[in-house]
Amino acid sequence: MQKSGIFILNKPSNISTYQLINQVKKKLNIKKVGHCGTLDLLATGVVICLVNNATKISDYLLNANKAYQVKIKLFTLTDSFDAEGNIIQTQTPFNISLDQINKVISKYNNYTYNQYPPIYSSIKVDGKKLYEYALTNQNVEIKSRKVTIYKTSLLSYDQKNYEIFLDVKCSKGTYIRSLAVDICKDLNTIGYVVYLNRTLSGNFKLENAIDLNNISWDHLISINDAIRTNDFKVVKYQNSLEIIQGKKIILNDINDDLVFISDDQNNILAVYQKYDNNIFKIKRGGLNNDIY
């Protein structure tokens, strides 16, 4: 029997998220794995690995906000917006004051805008990923996506090496590489990401993340704890058999459209969605079953 739950992984640089998850699967002989959002090849930090039935809650954890530390190199631009790409533009360095940087940074606080993702990304257009268009030199229309930058803080400014180091808290779907380019545009220059580290995914923190070499089943976080850690609405329901059978249920005084249902022992059994007034219907069941 295998348990279900999540691992908080600390992804190293120069390995894809897919490779990382696959290595966890092989190392622990896990039957079913998934993840809650990719990181760029060169990026490091928090990756949520879903194990067995926890893959059923991927959409909910994927919607969580994120936090990053990012270092931006000014006066040079690459086609991928990071150090992995080819240099496509350079600019003669000029003086950018600390006040100018702080003024631009202050714009990106509780700031919602339409962001264009990089061409080298996994977003699909007409069934193909954007980077596939780039690799074959095909033209494709890149559509913007609405994102929110909740807070941007300047950690340091290295004027000698033309590097800005930022801490960013943002909504799901934000491309930090695109944000870096947008910030540089506001500074009337160009730039690309030379360092990116995800420090937070939902309420899962980097300091609690496990390196691949040290991972064991002891580090598994249960589905119950994963859901409660991220402050989802959890409602206790007396008749757990109705939940197991996937029946519609009545929940009074619930304003949320989506709730997790637990039994008397606080085991989360399913996700329910509001159907009509106080009637809820099952959206995802079988969350508390282990895999045999």
Curated annotation (Swiss-Prot):
Its EC number is 5.4.99.25. It catalyses: uridine(55) in tRNA = pseudouridine(55) in tRNA. Keywords: Isomerase, tRNA processing. The active site is at residue 40. Gene3D superfamilies: Pseudouridine synthase. One of its GO terms (biological process) is mRNA pseudouridine synthesis. Pfam families: TruB_N. The keyword tRNA processing applies. It is an enzyme of class 5 (isomerase). GO terms for molecular function: RNA binding; tRNA pseudouridine(55) synthase activity. Coiled coil: none annotated. It comes from the Bacteria. Responsible for synthesis of pseudouridine from uracil-55 in the psi GC loop of transfer RNAs. Belongs to the pseudouridine synthase TruB family. Type 1 subfamily. NCBIfam families: TruB. This is tRNA pseudouridine synthase B. It comes from Mycoplasma mycoides subsp. mycoides SC (strain CCUG 32753 / NCTC 10114 / PG1). The gene is truB.
